[in-house]
UniProtKB/Swiss-Prot annotation:
It is found in: Cytoplasm. GO terms for biological process: formation of cytoplasmic translation initiation complex. Component of the eukaryotic translation initiation factor 3 (eIF-3) complex, which is involved in protein synthesis of a specialized repertoire of mRNAs and, together with other initiation factors, stimulates binding of mRNA and methionyl-tRNAi to the 40S ribosome. The eIF-3 complex specifically targets and initiates translation of a subset of mRNAs involved in cell proliferation. It comes from Aspergillus terreus (strain NIH 2624 / FGSC A1156). This is Eukaryotic translation initiation factor 3 subunit J. Residues 45-65, 73-86, 98-118, 218-230 have a biased composition (Basic and acidic residues). The keyword Protein biosynthesis applies. One of its GO terms (cellular component) is eukaryotic 48S preinitiation complex. Gene3D superfamilies: Eukaryotic translation initiation factor 3 like domains. The gene is hcr1. Keywords: Coiled coil, Cytoplasm, Initiation factor, Protein biosynthesis.
Amino acid sequence: MAPSKWDDEEESTSPPPVAYRRKFDDEEEEDVLDSWDAAEDSEVEREKAAKAAEAKAKAEAEAAAKKKSKAQRIQEHKEERKKREEEDSSSESEEDEAERRARLRRTEKDSDLKHAEDLFGDIDLNRTRNRGAPKAVVVSDSADPTQAVDLSAMPLFKPTTKDQFTRLTTTLAPLLTAHSKKPQYALWAQEFTKQLVKELNSGDVKKIASALTTMSNEKMREERAADKGNKKSKAAKTKVSLVTSRENKIDASYDDDDGLDDDDFM
């Protein structure tokens, strides 16, 4: 019976193995998945933050550009124009004088248009520029129709500066005012003035009307002074004529009266 006792003790001291859940393995796998998700989320957040920072910097730069004064923008355009001219001159040193002047005019015109767009915003400058462009005005000789001149192509009729407008005035005014004594001149001048101010705004038209009113008042004063002078001269002439006539009448009466009556001879 002894062996059976040892067998019982051996069986009692060796309990059957218990199957444990792999808790740590499962938890480690879940932790790895969570860390991957967190890494992806952080990468997305970093991209969003970078985009937001870039957009903010761009907005701040645009706001700073808008806050620049007019003088600063003009100075920047001048510097840009000068830099572009220097680059063009270095790259096109072999061009002749006429080509260089034409290029400089184009460069200056483009810079001025860019400057205007910067100052005035979304105004349709192309539409405004085309509207202000002069149409072809061709004058032909009735005796020889083949002889024609396009006035709009002449530099005189393309003024841009104050001196050029003054030259245009001094050229045209004598040609037009030479007909001021003709009966239809005043009516033509009214219609001509309307056409001249047709494209101006109301403020500029008001200034021109005020200048014409001032000229009208000056003309009235001159005419009144001239009429007054004529009346004084006429009155003086009339007075002298009356005095002369009276003196002649008095002298005639003395000549007829010798101081003797007819009875003195009796």
